[in-house]
């Protein structure tokens, strides 16, 4: 099996070869089911019998109608039925190597054929091929987890092993399909079951470099310090591959950093011999250890505080308060020629302190956008606006501009309330299940509905994903009606806080405009300095600037914020009118646009039901293709792209392009949740949930009726469009504002 071959890291050049290291890597499964690279069974690409026959196969060709193996491979149920009716073969027929028709149907993802053979009496535990493997093992090596589930339902033993001692859990781990692993782990297979060399599933996942599988095993209770026959622990195997996420995750779960193999090799020595020292050192640093693996000792006993996530969250939140004050004070009290470079040095120095603290703190704070720092930037701006207004602007303008002051106080208060509510409120986390039995029941239900895929199940939260939900990597939770994760509030925006977030943006927009008006009147009413001296500006502008430079610079700063606030407000209002979230706006709706009659015909032939969705089959009659749910590799882009996302520019221009797009309206992807602008706006703004207070988790208005997005798994019938709406598949894209 190609996916089980040792990775290139084991054949390192020079002295770092596996032979020089003395390691004994897990050998790859072999046999008939591993004779060719894995292929997804489609109309024109399936595992051919001829490609997997041994050289001893007879040269004489067999007519298709009489070749039971070929019939099983291509899924011709009617032809197979005819062979059985004519008594030419039985369901338990096997060739000289013990391979049965069920093996070929399983490896080619022929669900209907597998079901027919099982109903006809086929042995689900029959072993065959050079690897002496069962049909479930063959299917597992191609990640056909619907086939595996079918076989398990009919008595397939998940603890059976092939000739090399691999059971189905090991084979599934080698291919790295998390959904198949979730299915198998819920079959009560011991998570640390070993192969003939003592390798656990966690060791295989670490060796192959599959972070998602490593995380799944560890969350399931796998032992991070288990050792194989050679004394190698999962940490050693992760360093053989050199996967940083795998090493980090294993260290996070308490792996022994000094564990030695039977020949005395520590993880550090393995990293040195496998040329993965850079991975080892970086992992140690991010986990708070020095290069020798010892816990870093910080001066003045700061270690416990710096490593405390709650304390560091507060530090990053309040640090921008100081940064803003220092910069504004320098720029307002020094000569411009000195002020600009000194302010730049101050910013660099304060940022260096923050980054230094981040490098010693929790690993999730390594990137500044993943800390509450940006939320602190806004909160700091809000704080200094309040201080300046109370101490200087209000005393000078309350008698001359009473209504303007009243308006500002109202909108400042509303902005503050809605901001902190959006930041601290539960955005709509989908409740997790209470036990593994509940998880098993949900998985079984999804298999019955042909919906066990990433659109409908989250392998991180182990829950069924409601429509419009998305798993947020930052929050590590699925959020109902997920809009986006906003770093400016350090929280997700979802069904529970979306309305408050929109109100926060709108009140902020009005508040900024009122404050700019007030401060202009305030500065204009101040007496001019007796001898204004400026190096660049003319006397008139210089006189105005020097009246209260600090307040004027604060005005410039918040006026800059007005740009992205305006764009974000426009985008949110447009999306409200469409009943659309930011994520849906950026990624689009997943619509099945296949012709209904064609799909019904194909489904009826292969699965006995006219609903292709109910059968979960492709147009060729094959089982669901797990590869179709896998997202491709994503490039995060450079600094400009990241800041464009943070400031909302990409969302604004995407919305503008969508609004100005040429062509008929019908050509656009249809949103089955939209009921027209008036109804959409009424649902959003007239929702009976309180504006000032918590709503019932997950509840919202849809078409004038109360719905709960925590439990919405089917689109309401009145919202049905020409295509079947599906929940937007989650991918780990950059944060969208």
Swiss-Prot record:
Membrane side Lumenal: residue ranges: 394-402, 522-549
PROSITE patterns referenced in this protein's UniProt entry, alphabetically: ANK_REP_REGION, ANK_REPEAT, DHHC
Gene Ontology CC annotation, any one: Golgi membrane
Stretches for region Disordered: 1-60
Pfam families in the cross-refs: Ank_2 (PF12796), DHHC (PF01529)
Chain segments annotated as coiled-coil in the UniProt record: none
Transmembrane segments: 315-335, 336-356, 373-393, 403-423, 501-521, 550-570
Residue intervals on the Cytoplasmic side: 1-314, 357-372, 424-500, 571-737
Function summary: Palmitoyltransferase specific for casein kinase 1.
Membrane-protein topology: Multi-pass membrane protein
Stored SMART domains: ANK
Residue windows of the ANK repeats: 97-126, 131-160, 164-193, 197-226, 230-259
Keyword Lipoprotein annotated: yes
Protein name: Palmitoyltransferase akr1
Signal peptide region: none
Record-stated family: Belongs to the DHHC palmitoyltransferase family. AKR/ZDHHC17 subfamily.
Gene name of the encoded protein: akr1
Compartments, as annotated in UniProt: Early endosome membrane; Golgi apparatus membrane
Statement: the UniProt record of this protein carries the keyword Acyltransferase: yes
């Amino acid at each position: 099996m190609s996916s089980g071959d040792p990775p290139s890291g084991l054949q390192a050049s020079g002295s770092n070869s596996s032979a020089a290291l003395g390691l004994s890597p897990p050998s790859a499964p072999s046999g008939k089911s591993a004779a060719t690279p894995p292929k997804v069974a489609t109309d024109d690409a399936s595992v051919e019998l001829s490609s997997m026959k041994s050289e001893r196969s007879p040269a004489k060709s067999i007519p298709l109608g009489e070749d039971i193996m070929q019939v099983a491979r291509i899924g011709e149920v009617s032809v197979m039925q005819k062979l059985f009716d004519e008594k030419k073969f039985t369901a338990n027929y096997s060739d000289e190597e013990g391979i049965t028709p069920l093996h070929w149907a399983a490896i080619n993802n022929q669900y209907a054929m597998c079901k027919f053979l099982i109903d006809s009496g086929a042995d689900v535990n029959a072993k065959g091929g050079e690897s002496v493997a069962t049909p479930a093992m063959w299917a597992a090596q191609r990640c056909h987890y619907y086939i595996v589930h079918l076989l398990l339902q009919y008595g397939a033993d998940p603890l059976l092993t092939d000739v090399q001692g691999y059971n189905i859990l090991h084979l599934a781990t080698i291919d790295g399909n998390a959904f198949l692993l979730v299915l198998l782990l819920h079959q009560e297979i011991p998570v640390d079951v070993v192969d003939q060399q003592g390798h656990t599933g966690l060791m295989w996942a670490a060796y192959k470099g599959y972070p998602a599988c490593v995380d799944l095993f560890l969350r399931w209770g796998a032992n991070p310090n288990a050792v194989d026959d050679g004394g190698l622990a999962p940490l050693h195997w992760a360093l053989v591959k050199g996967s940083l996420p795998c090493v980090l995750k294993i260290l996070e779960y308490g792996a022994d950093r000094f564990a030695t193999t039977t020949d005395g090799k520590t993880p550090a020595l393995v990293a040195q011999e496998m040329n993965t020292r850079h991975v080892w050192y970086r992992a140690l640093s991010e986990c708070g250890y020095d290069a020798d693996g010892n816990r870093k000792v910080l001066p003045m006993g700061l270690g416990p505080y710096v490593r405390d996530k709650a304390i560091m969250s507060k530090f990053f939140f309040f640090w921008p308060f100081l940064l803003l004050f220092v910069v504004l004070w320098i720029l307002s009290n020094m000569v411009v020629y000195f002020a600009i470079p000194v302010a730049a040095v101050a910013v660099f120095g304060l940022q260096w302190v923050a980054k230094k603290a981040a490098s010693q703190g929790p690993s999730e704070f390594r990137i500044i956008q993943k800390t509450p720092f940006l939320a602190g930037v806004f909160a700091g701006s809000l704080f200094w606006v309040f201080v300046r207004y109370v101490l200087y602007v209000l005393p000078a303008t309350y008698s001359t501009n009473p209504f303007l002051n009243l308006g500002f106080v109202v909108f400042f208060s509303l902005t503050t309330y809605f901001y902190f509510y959006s930041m601290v409120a539960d955005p709509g986390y989908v409740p997790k299940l209470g036990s593994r039995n509940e998880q098993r029941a949900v998985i079984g239900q999804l298999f019955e509905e042909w919906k066990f895929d990433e659109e409908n199940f989250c392998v991180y939260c182990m829950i069924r994903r409601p429509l419009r939900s998305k798993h947020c990597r930052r929050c590590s939770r699925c959020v109902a009606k997920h809009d986006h994760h906003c770093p400016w509030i350090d929280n997700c925006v979802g069904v529970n806080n979306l309305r408050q977030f929109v109100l926060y943006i709108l009140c902020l927009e009005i508040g900024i405009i009122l404050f700019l008006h007030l401060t202009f009147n305030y500065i204009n009413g101040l007496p001019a300095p007796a001898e204004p001296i400026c190096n660049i500006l003319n006397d008139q502008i210089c006189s105005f600037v020097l009246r209260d430079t600090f307040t004027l610079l604060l005005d410039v700063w918040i006026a800059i914020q007005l740009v992205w606030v305006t764009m974000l407000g426009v985008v949110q209002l447009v999306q409200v009118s469409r009943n659309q979230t930011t994520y849906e706006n950026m990624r689009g709706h997943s619509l099945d646009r296949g012709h209904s009659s064609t799909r019904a015909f194909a489904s009826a032939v292969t699965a006995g039901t006219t609903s292709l969705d109910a059968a979960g089959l492709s147009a060729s009659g094959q089982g669901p293709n797990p590869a179709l749910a896998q997202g491709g590799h994503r490039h995060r882009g450079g600094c400009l792209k990241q800041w464009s996302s943070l400031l909302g520019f990409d969302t604004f221009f995407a919305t503008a392009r969508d609004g100005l797009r040429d062509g008929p309206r019908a050509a656009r992807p249809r949103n089955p949740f939209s009921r027209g602008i008036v109804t959409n706006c009424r649902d959003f703004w007239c929702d009976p949930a309180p504006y000032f207070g918590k709503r019932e988790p997950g509840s919202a208005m849809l078409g004038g009726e109360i719905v709960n997005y925590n439990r919405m798994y089917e689109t309401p019938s009145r919202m049905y469009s020409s295509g079947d709406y599906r929940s937007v598949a989650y991918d780990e894209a950059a944060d969208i504002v």
